[in-house]
């Protein structure tokens, strides 16, 4: 009697779509609200680098504790937010551990809050660079937030297919995002936010024209 063996799913799949998001804006511009609107936080695999505790996920407060959790979960379910000192060393270890459990057959959302605190300008640091360049085909879906787009690495800017731009408050930030969104700095500034009611933002999807959108709060 012939028996069949279930085909093992490869760890990488180069055909997976690029859904990486770069989420840029000053404090109160709607970055976290946009991410909450996009991400299923009840999903099986959601991780966050979350220094300011913006997201409702099980909280981990040391790299050692995070490492134990990662080793226990492997390619299985894992949901947590890591809140530690925002140093490049800690962030690199976070990225290294996240990449180790990334798998095309088990998609995983990875949120990075305030990248400018831990990123290098220009080329990405080694493990962050690996996660941002290779993560897509390993099933990683990145949501990378920052208030200072001019202070982050160019690697992640190139890798993100979706670019969100909320209100900004510096000329260098306006210029940086104008270049990335194919808009003028004047257009970048034309966003109307109403406290507790709405935020407006620009969103670019790949090569499509940048669109102005509104997120309302109930």
UniProtKB/Swiss-Prot annotation:
Its main location: virion. CDD domains: TrwB_TraG_TraD_VirD4. Keywords: Capsid inner membrane protein, Membrane, Virion. It is found in: Virion membrane. One of its GO terms (cellular component) is viral inner membrane. The keyword Membrane applies. PANTHER family: SLR6007 PROTEIN, UNCHARACTERIZED PROTEIN YJGR-RELATED. This is Protein P9.
């Amino acid at each position: 009697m012939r028996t069949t063996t279930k085909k093992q799913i490869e760890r990488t799949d180069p055909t997976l779509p690029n859904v990486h998001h770069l989420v840029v804006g000053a404090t109160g511009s709607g970055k976290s609200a946009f991410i909450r609107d996009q991400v299923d936080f009840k999903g099986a695999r959601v991780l966050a680098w979350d220094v300011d505790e913006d997201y409702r996920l099980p909280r981990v407060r040391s790299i050692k504790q995070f490492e134990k959790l990662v080793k226990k979960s492997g390619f299985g379910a894992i949901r947590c937010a890591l809140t530690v000192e925002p140093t490049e060393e800690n962030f690199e270890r976070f990225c290294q551990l996240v990449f180790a459990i990334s798998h095309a057959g088990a998609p995983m959302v990875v949120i990075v809050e305030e990248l400018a605190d831990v990123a290098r300008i220009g080329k990405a640091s080694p493990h962050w660079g690996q996660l941002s360049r290779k993560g897509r085909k390993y099933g990683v879906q990145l949501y990378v937030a920052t208030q200072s787009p001019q202070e982050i690495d160019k690697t992640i800017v190139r890798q993100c297919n979706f670019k969100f731009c909320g209100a900004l408050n510096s000329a260098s930030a306006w210029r940086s995002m104008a270049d990335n969104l194919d808009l003028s700095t004047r257009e970048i500034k034309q966003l109307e936010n109403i406290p507790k009611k709405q935020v407006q933002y620009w969103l670019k999807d790949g090569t499509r024209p940048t669109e102005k959108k509104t997120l309302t709060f109930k």
